[in-house]
Swiss-Prot record:
GO cellular component, as recorded: nucleosome; nucleus
Keywords, in A-Z order: Chromosome, DNA-binding, Nucleus
Comp. bias (Basic residues): 122-134, 141-151, 158-196, 204-220
Protein name: Histone H1B
A Pfam family the protein falls into: Linker_histone
Gene3D superfamilies given in the database record: Winged helix-like DNA-binding domain superfamily/Winged helix DNA-binding domain (1.10.10.10)
Entry's family note: Belongs to the histone H1/H5 family.
Domain spans labelled H15: 40-113
Low complexity bias locations: 28-45
Regions that span the bilayer: none
The keyword DNA-binding is assigned to this record: yes
Compartment annotation: Nucleus; Chromosome
Length: 220
């Protein structure tokens, strides 16, 4: 009997562990259900803007008329009544809707045409702005191409170096011309000296004539 009483209390502690596991798993299911409830379609503000823009009433659209239009589109108005009121107030503060009558969420509402016109103009101007940026980028890229002629200018500078080398080659020619002049002057001086030596040559020519005249005398 004592053995059975000691072993019996050991089994129950396993049950609270299982209960803890079930408690942890349950909140996960609830979180998954909350995520599934989020609407995947358009927001309440978008639906209100569509309903007001589609209406042809000049005096504006009342809250009751909005609810009818949204209910006809399949929107649950009863569950999302608070969201509709908050969306209406937010649209009025932003300026997308103008409140013609009443205050708060009650009354009648119209679309703010001025803001819509500005949005349309901004939407039309936005595509034009990227084109201007592209042209500006193209204009910046265009001047980059003339950088290549710099190499040509560097090549054009090389003839200057060739000219300098040609001038350097011409400069040694000048001393050669000077040397030629000096050489030409020296033979001229030598040519003047032999003039004095010509006088004895004439005397030598005169002597043989006298010898020839002496030979015929013995023949007689």
């Amino acid at each position: 009997m004592t053995a059975t009483t000691e072993t019996a209390p050991v089994a129950p502690p396993a049950e609270p562990a299982a209960a803890k596991k079930t408690k942890k798993q349950q909140p996960k299911k609830v979180a998954g259900g909350a995520k599934a409830k989020k609407p995947s379609g358009p927001s309440a503000s978008e639906l209100i803007v569509k309903a007001v823009s589609s209406s042809k009433e000049r005096s504006g659209v009342s809250l009751a008329a909005l609810k009818k239009a949204l209910a006809a589109g399949g929107y649950d108005v009863d569950k999302n009544n608070s969201r509709l009121k908050l969306a209406l107030k937010a649209l009025v503060t932003k300026g997308t809707l103008t409140q013609v009558k009443g205050s708060g969420a009650s009354g009648s509402f119209k679309l703010n045409k001025k803001q819509l016109e500005t949005k349309d103009k901004a939407a039309k101007k936005k595509p034009a702005a990227p084109k201007a940026k592209k042209t500006a980028a193209g204009a910046k890229k265009a001047p980059k191409s003339p950088k290549k002629p710099k190499k040509v200018s560097a090549a054009a500078k090389s003839p200057k170096k060739v000219k300098k080398l040609a001038k350097a080659a011409k400069s040694p020619k000048k001393p050669k011309a000077v040397k030629a002049k000096k050489v030409a002057k020296s033979p001229a001086k030598k040519a003047t000296k032999p003039k004095t030596a010509k006088s004895p040559a004439k005397a030598k020519v005169a002597k043989p004539k006298a010898a020839k005249a002496k030979k015929p005398a013995p023949k007689k």
